[in-house]
Amino acid sequence: MSLDASIFSGGHGHPFAESTAALGEILEERGWRTRVLLTLEDTVASLPHTDLLVVNALYWSMTQHEKYAPFRERLAFWASDSQIDRLESWVGAGGRLLAMHTACLCFDTQPRWLGLLGGGWTWGVSYHPALGPIKVELTDGGRFELVDEVYHHLSPRPEAEVWARGAVNEGPQPVVWTRRYGEGRVALDALGHDRRSFDAPAHRALIGRLLDWLAA
C-alpha cells in the first residue's frame, strides 16, 4: 500500500500541536507522508487520498458538565451522520485508522464512532486519574513506565484484541487494542497525553508496531 497519512488534530485541554508533531515524527521515520488537518470536514474530504487516518483530537458536545460551559461556544462539536457514514465506509473498504488518546472521547453524540473504534470512553462511567507516572504491561510480554494518563473503564468490544494495559488506580486497564472492520483495520492507543508520552522509547516502539499492523 502507499503511505499517505492524514492527522486530524486539535480540540480541548491538551497540547495537540506538540503531540501531533511527535506523532508526525514517528510516522515519517517509518516512511509515511503526513499532512495535518484541523477540521473534521477537511479530514473527511481527504479520505479518498488517505491510506492512514490518525485522530489526535478532542471534539465533543461538551454537554456533560457545566465546567465545560466557558468552552462550548468555541469548541463544542457534533459530528454529522454523513461524516460518520463516510468514516465507516472508508475504513470498511480498506482504510486504516489510528485513534490516539482523546480520540475515544470524540463525537459523543454518534455511538457508531465507538463502534468503529471497538470501544472507548463512556461518559459517567469512564474516568482517568491525574497525569503522572504509570506502568504499562504488554499482553505479549514486557512492560514499561512513562508519564501519562490511564483511562479507566473504556470497555473494548469482544472483537478487539488488547495489546496493552495500564495500571495506576483500579488495576490493569485496557489502553491499547486493535480490531478489523470490514476490509480495514483500526487501532486505538489511549496513551499519549503530551509529548513526554511520545518521547518514551517503549511507547514509540509500541506505536511503531501498531503502524506496522495497520499497514499490513
Regions found by a protein language model. Name each.
Residues 11, 103, 192:
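Residue-level signal for short, function-critical loop segments
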Residues 21, 112-196:
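Catalytic beta-strand/loop cores that center a nucleophilic Ser/Cys/Thr
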Residues 60-141:
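A glycine-rich, often tryptophan-bearing local segment used as a flexible ligand/cofactor-contacting loop or short
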